[in-house]
């Protein structure tokens, strides 16, 4: 065998045409792209191949249908080898003919692999790619079969929606391509709208805390047979209207512990030892009614843990979500992760049909550093090991998000092949996308990873730069990061494309500097204004659309920063005053609230700094100015962040007294309900045309106490938060 191999290699080198398929030679070609099937996938593959061969060689290969191939032709489609699975492909060169076949989208991914591995083309981001022009394209002997690590692969990057090639090149899919009629997660209210059934049939919805809770965000009474029949009819009509789809999601609305606890539902869940019991029982009935269809349902928050007895039917897909896990180390290395892993291992014992939704994102601060590159591969390997066949790696993929392009590139590669060399891929991307700046950015990434782990601070999906100001973002490290970015910008100063990419990658450090600065009592106002102006200039230049999941604009942030966080000309008379609570804040906020309401520091969009909260109750406190003073206004600043169940209160009442006992009513202010998803601040102010002499100011707040029917915490305690009381 060895003698034969050496003989064949010698013959191949002496007669290269025996081992090569020649597509273009010295700028000339007679090759054709032949489609075995005249369908959209084949045409997508052909157009992609034609486009990039033309970009490399300036030769445009014709595309023809169902013709007999000859030497030098490219055959797309046809029968795939038996070992090819969903989205997998085969590439072979035989008798001078290049053959690419695949299942589902496989022929497109085969073309991408050919262009990457044999023509040396890299696709980095939105209409951003690298290639080396050549007048000759000769392919070696190829016999390759590749199958994806996951049959469905999804992530987030702005380029998916702005560049028609990007998604194909990264071998990604989107829910609307797979799931019927947009029925993908949190579908209960779409299938059984509370606006239609809630008033007349509250029994269709969750029972807890002594009553039914119909509402847009409520869950179903899964033991109610009428609910099942209505939903089954809806499912039937949806699939009939979408005959090309075979999967849809029947899954709980967003929110936690809003499940039904009626006697029948509770009996199922108690027997199963998990709140997923009733939903899997329901889904199995649906799967049996429609055996040729597939149903995806969430194992999310209260349904994360698997049932003890009932097993999901093969056509029930478990969408398992690790939303509560911290991200500073792998899932097997911290307590929150271990809890999830235990649940995942439990599911993997009873089903092979698992979809893992992994959260590598900071929902509250897309532009904050999120150094989790070191955990990506181990976590994805873990998912695959535990029978995950579908995977959504959710990242901050919006324009300006922390290394959005690199992050999407890496998770896409890992979802296709969990065994790739991640460090090599990272360095390859950095050099290709940032040029000579790459070594400095690589150092920045690695130093921050080490600093995060060394700090012992958690990294989570509602994080804030302020949480890390004594850890990975402490002053000495921030100076080092900025020095590395200075070197990176200098290295590519003469190359505008690379320079802009480096400047965009710097935004998270600039944003972090501003966020940390607003929490400091001593401020270098000249420096802050300079940094704020530059940040605003850059987010406009790079068209950064949003700071967070709630769609708050970075341009609005800059405006708000100047109004809210920069020192005002007139000082509050309440600064440093004594605060006495009549109805104290909840939990840890009682201690934090001793000074926070009168320290002159306004809180940010997250509630990790400066905010004081009350849960499920009203609030009341007295501010002692220390002596009688003349005042004309009092204003209390509130936070609205529905994702954290933080709502504006219903009412604020102000009164005052000179002796601290006999109070005079000043003003009662009723607040309008706010339902927007955006994070908002609202100052509730009482004013007097004439000065009021007083020492004590009482603030009484009537909270919503309970999340309303439209909120996904329906029926559970709501919060209100105050960061500052201003008296002038």
What is each model feature region?
Residues 296-324, 367-374, 400-408:
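Substrate-binding cleft/loops of secretory-pathway carbohydrate-active enzymes
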Residues 603-665, 680-728:
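Aromatic, loop-rich ligand-recognition surfaces of beta-strand-rich domains
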Residues 62-85:
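Short, well-ordered secondary-structure micro-motifs within conserved domains or adaptor modules
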Residues 226-229, 338-437, 443:
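Structured mid-domain segments that build the active-site/substrate or prosthetic-cofactor binding neighborhood
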Residues 306-313, 320-362:
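Glycoside hydrolase catalytic-domain groove-lining segments
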Residues 414-594:
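Catalytic domains of carbohydrate-active enzymes that cleave complex glycans
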Residues 29-30, 38-41, 45-48, 52, ...:
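Feature activates predominantly on carbohydrate-active enzymes
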């Amino acid at each position: 065998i060895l003698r034969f191999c050496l003989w064949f290699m010698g013959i191949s080198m002496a007669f290269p045409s025996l081992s090569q398929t020649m597509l273009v030679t010295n700028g000339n070609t007679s090759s054709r792209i032949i489609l075995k099937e005249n369908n959209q996938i084949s045409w997508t593959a052909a157009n992609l191949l034609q486009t990039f061969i033309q970009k490399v060689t300036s030769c445009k290969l014709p595309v023809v249908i169902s013709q007999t191939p000859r030497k030098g032709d490219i055959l797309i489609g046809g029968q795939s080898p038996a070992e090819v699975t969903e989205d997998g492909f085969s590439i072979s060169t035989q008798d001078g003919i290049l053959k690419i076949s695949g299942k589902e989208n496989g022929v497109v991914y085969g073309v991408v692999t050919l262009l990457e591995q044999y023509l040396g083309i890299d696709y980095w981001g939105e209409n951003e790619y690298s290639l080396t022009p050549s007048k000759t394209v000769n392919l070696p002997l190829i016999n390759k079969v590749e199958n994806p690590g996951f049959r469905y692969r999804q992530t987030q990057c702005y380029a998916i929606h702005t560049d028609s090639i990007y998604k194909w090149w990264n071998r990604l899919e989107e829910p609307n391509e797979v799931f019927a009629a947009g029925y993908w997660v949190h579908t209960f209210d779409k299938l059984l709208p509370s606006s239609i059934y809630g008033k007349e049939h509250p029994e269709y919805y969750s029972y807890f805390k002594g009553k039914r809770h119909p509402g847009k965000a409520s869950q179903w009474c899964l033991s109610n047979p009428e609910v099942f029949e209505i939903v089954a009819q809806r499912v039937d009509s949806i699939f009939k209207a979408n005959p090309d789809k075979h999967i849809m999601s029947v899954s709980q609305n967003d929110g936690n512990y809003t499940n039904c606890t009626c006697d029948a539902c509770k009996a199922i869940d108690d027997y199963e030892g998990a709140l997923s019991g009733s939903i899997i029982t329901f889904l199995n009935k649906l799967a049996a009614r429609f055996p040729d269809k597939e149903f995806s349902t969430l194992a999310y928050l209260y349904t994360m843990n698997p049932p003890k007895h009932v097993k999901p039917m093969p056509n029930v897909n478990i969408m398992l979500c690790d939303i509560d896990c911290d991200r500073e180390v792998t899932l097997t290395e911290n307590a929150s992760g271990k809890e999830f892993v235990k649940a995942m291992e439990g599911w993997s014992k009873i089903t092979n049909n698992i979809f893992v939704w992994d959260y590598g994102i900071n929902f509250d601060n897309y532009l904050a550093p999120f150094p989790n590159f070191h955990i990506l591969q181990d976590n994805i390997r873990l998912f695959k090991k535990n029978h995950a066949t579908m995977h959504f790696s959710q990242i901050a993929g919006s324009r300006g998000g922390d290394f959005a392009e690199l992050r999407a590139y890496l998770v896409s590669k890992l979802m296709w092949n969990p065994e790739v060399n991640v460090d090599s891929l990272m360095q390859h991307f950095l050099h290709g996308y940032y040029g000579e700046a790459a070594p400095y950015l690589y150092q920045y990434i690695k130093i921050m990873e080490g600093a995060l782990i060394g700090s012992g601070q958690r990294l989570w999906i509602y994080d804030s730069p302020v949480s890390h100001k004594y850890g990975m973002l402490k002053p000495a490290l921030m100076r080092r990061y900025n020095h590395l970015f200075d070197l990176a910008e200098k290295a590519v100063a003469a190359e505008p494309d690379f320079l802009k990419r480096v400047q965009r990658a710097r935004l998270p450090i600039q944003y972090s500097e501003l966020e940390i600065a607003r929490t400091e009592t001593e401020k270098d106002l000249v420096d802050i204004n300079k940094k704020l102006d530059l940040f605003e200039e850059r987010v406009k230049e790079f068209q950064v659309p949003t700071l967070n999941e709630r769609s708050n604009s970075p341009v609005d942030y800059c405006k708000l920063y100047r109004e809210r966080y920069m020192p005002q000309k007139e000082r509050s008379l309440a600064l440093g005053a004594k605060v006495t609570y009549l109805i104290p804040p909840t939990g840890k906020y009682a201690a934090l609230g001793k000074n926070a309401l009168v320290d002159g520091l306004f809180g940010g969009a997250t509630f990790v700094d400066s905010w004081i909260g009350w849960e499920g109750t009203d609030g009341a406190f007295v501010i002692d100015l220390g002596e009688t003073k003349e005042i004309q206004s009092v204003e209390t600043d509130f936070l609205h962040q529905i994702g954290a169940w933080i709502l504006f209160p219903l009412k604020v009442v102000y009164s005052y007294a000179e002796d601290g006992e006999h109070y005079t009513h000043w003003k009662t202010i009723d607040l309008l309900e706010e339902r927007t998803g955006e994070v908002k601040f609202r100052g509730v102010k009482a004013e007097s045309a004439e000065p009021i002499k007083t020492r004590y100011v009482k603030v009484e707040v009537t909270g919503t106490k309970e999340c309303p029917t439209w909120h996904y915490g329906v029926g559970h305690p709501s919060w209100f938060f105050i960061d500052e009381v201003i008296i002038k």
